[in-house]
Amino acid sequence: MIYQSPTIQVELLEDNIAKLCFNAPGSVNKFDRETLASLDAALDSIKQDSNIKALVLTSSKDTFIVGADITEFLGLFAQDDAVLLSWVEQANAVFNKLEDLPFPTASAIKGFALGGGCETILATDFRVADTTAKIGLPETKLGIIPGFGGTVRLPRVIGADNALEWITTGKDQRAEDALKVGAVDAVVAPQALEAAAIQMLKDAVAEKLDWQARRNRKLSALTLPKLEAMMSFTTAKGMVFAVAGKHYPAPMAAVSVIEQASTKGRAEALQIEHQAFIKLAKTDVAKALIGIFLNDQFVKGKAKKAGKLAKEVNNAAVLGAGIMGGGIAYQSASKGTPIVMKDIAQPALDLGLNEAAKLLSAQVARGRSTPEKMAKVLNNITPSLDYAAIKHSDVVVEAVVEHPKIKAQVLAEVEGYVSEDAIIASNTSTISINLLAKSMKKPERFCGMHFFNPVHKMPLVEVIRGEHSSEETIASVVAYASKMGKTPIVVNDCPGFFVNRVLFPYFAGFNGLLAEGGDFAAIDKVMEKQFGWPMGPAYLLDVVGLDTGHHAQAVMAEGFPDRMGKSGTDAIDVMFENKRLGQKNGKGFYVYSVDSRGKPKKDVDPTSYGLLKDAFGELKAFEADDIIARTMIPMIIETVRCLEEGIVASPAEADMGLVYGLGFPPFRGGVFRYLDTMGVANFVALADKYAHLGGLYQVTDAMRTLAANNGSYYQA
């Protein structure tokens, strides 16, 4: 053994080829500080052994290296610039040491080689992947750029245009696609991986492959003609800004870094990367996006832990077909759990099956599935008009019409057809789980399971704990949601649960602006372009449906009359009473037509303005800051109330619920990250300026205490 540490082992193989194996404790290899230090020491040992003729990098895991240890980032990025620069320079010295070894090097890549893992393989002369490999630099998704030489080496390996696409999108690349652009030199079967990499090194040692020429290309400036370079980078800037926009600076910074470094050798090019990396690491956007990543890991970790208490779900059922039932059936079947789709009407079953078939056909058309896989998924969906079909179901999801009496009746019926230990969950967005549980003989086997529409696109599922729901019931539904590919958060029962409870105060703020003459299209523009929502409140209400919004608003008013009670007609009432239901009937705040791609196209409609003018008077202009404050303050305070009341267990789960359930702007990180960035004391001072608008604008006593103590919701 040439070198050994808890994360890396180096041994000498035959023909004097050294094998460096990444072998960290745990299921995957990460580039944490310990691994980086071990790699540095291992390379020193390798350099000192004069017998070594070549080096192959391997992994003992199913993956190569998944990237840096992101749990270290927030603490590290909070350090002074000088400390951060020192860390980046030391890390890059290790990668340079690997690249400068006096003999050929190769990487044997299986599974993920992402971020620092990708930058590791780029520092070797040859790269061999097996068919499971996925390679990429996802750093821009975290608000930063690659910091271990990725922006320098990748363009010199695969060309500037390809590198710009890889780095600015942050997408993983399959082995076959990486081979096409030259990121890897060969793709082989998993069992042949190490042997293929070693053979490539033998050929290099025998001078059949010119490893030094490859290395020199990475050490030199890009060989791009001046005009071609100008066109390439100008085009990239336009395309990247069109996608990333002003709120996400990292992709544009990546283009700029690659452009500036294109005429430099390695040392100068790396300095350009270092400076841009440090600048981005200090941004609120990076803190927010890294926070989302860590929160996502936290939520998934909780779900995995809950799985230990879960009843195994081998068969499922959904009651109520149509679009929602069909979406749930598709999601379950496509992730491997057979499901019965039960309804009382054949047309509804046909609609549900058609919905599943449509979603699968779209997957086939995009090349993400095959006709054979589509047939297998459809065979996992069993439509039925008979309750007898659900008798072997481990979990039954009730998804009938959103009416308490109808749901209660169906739930009571279901218990008579399933086994004693079957779990029943209601897909409801507003109806109390405790209320529905009153119709159940075994309320401990019952909880809520709130899917968001469209089911196949929305990652969040709210699992609602009723006062009688058992831990096994909650754990089993959490595990089933995870198995379906969803991110579950557990919330306690209350009107609107978590997501809708915090959404409707936002709509109340919007209604308040319109009642004073606000222009709904102008408000949407501010909330989309400046705050960063994917849809402004008027557009969102049109998509949700004004009938749904009207009903849910009434539920919230009844549940929280002190804050959400209504004293008169509001804009949602005006639209609903004039049968303007939104996209579903082609007219709401906006009017809708179908564009050339078959997608809904919205236009401003004078009729809407006329109805609102009759109700509230002439239009009045509001400043953007005023619009943001009046809509967001109620949502933020209600989110804090949910945490204080234990409706949601942690800031991390609340923020993931907002990002995944409502599309809260990821670059702001969620309500609690937004509060911490703004400063709780600053928010309290802002809210107090609007306190005259009513209960929704009154901060809690606990918020005032936190503000007075200069506290925050996140510890890092």
Swiss-Prot record:
Keywords: Fatty acid metabolism, Isomerase, Lipid degradation, Lipid metabolism, Lyase, Multifunctional enzyme, NAD, Oxidoreductase. One of its GO terms (cellular component) is fatty acid beta-oxidation multienzyme complex. Substrate binds at D296, N500, Y660. GO terms for biological process: fatty acid beta-oxidation. NAD(+) binds at M324, D343, V400, V401, E402, K407, S429, N453. The record marks E119, E139 as: Important for catalytic activity. Residues 311-716 are annotated as: 3-hydroxyacyl-CoA dehydrogenase. GO terms for molecular function: 3-hydroxybutyryl-CoA epimerase activity; delta(3)-delta(2)-enoyl-CoA isomerase activity; enoyl-CoA hydratase activity; long-chain-3-hydroxyacyl-CoA dehydrogenase activity; NAD+ binding. Signal peptide: none annotated. Pathway: Lipid metabolism; fatty acid beta-oxidation. Its EC number is 4.2.1.17, 5.1.2.3, 5.3.3.8, 1.1.1.35. In the N-terminal section; belongs to the enoyl-CoA hydratase/isomerase family. Heterotetramer of two alpha chains (FadB) and two beta chains (FadA). This is Fatty acid oxidation complex subunit alpha.
